[in-house]
Amino acid sequence: MLVGIDEAGRGPVLGPLVIGICCVPDDAEPLLTSKGVKDSKDLSPKKRQEIEAWFHQQPTEDGWFGTTVSIDPETIDFALQDQGLNWLEVDGFREAMMHLPHRKHLRIVADACDVNAQRFTERITEGVSGWPWKGSEMVSEHKADEHHPVVSMASILAKEERDRAMQAMSERVGIQLGSGYPADPTTKTSLEHLILQSGIDEQVRWGWATVKRFWKEHRTGDLPVRGVQRTIQQQLFHEDESRIS
């Protein structure tokens, strides 16, 4: 069986980081290619949705499997305060692997999230329960989603799950959010509604440079920090703001 793992949403200031994993029969990659599977960034939203729906219709008894692991902004912020984003992704890739229904005779290809692809593999596998799995091997490659259809499929699953999370957030706050990436004009505009003097929305990555810069330019006082209780003055300000609204 072939397994692909990839992520979506490492760089955005809004929403989760999502890791996708999929498993297909050894001879299925030509079929994936024929269905238009390629790096999710090169596909329209409509095409990604069509491919995702098709994938989930494939017979699980033949080994087809796919799922995602979502890492919320709070967890991302705490990771930035600790070991960093690379280790967070290592943990996420491990978690994704543990969802696989079969753990033998697998060739696993991951899109490397570390400048050292071999190190990325080693960090993942050293924490995977029971590794090495019988008859299995794992490699990590840079731009694997461009060269391995099974990894491209994983990227599509991850991207679609992240898009759903962003849509849910947009509906909750009542504004358009764009892609969530700092360079997106719609995302930039949305920050005015998400980063308030009284607090920052939980689906914003508080530790991102974009947030720090916005706070410095448009808000006063110290930037809130995840896990640090706000001051009495901030709490009173929030209460006053609530009464005004």
What are the language-model segments listed below?
Residues M1-S245:
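RNase H-like, Mg2+-dependent phosphodiesterase core
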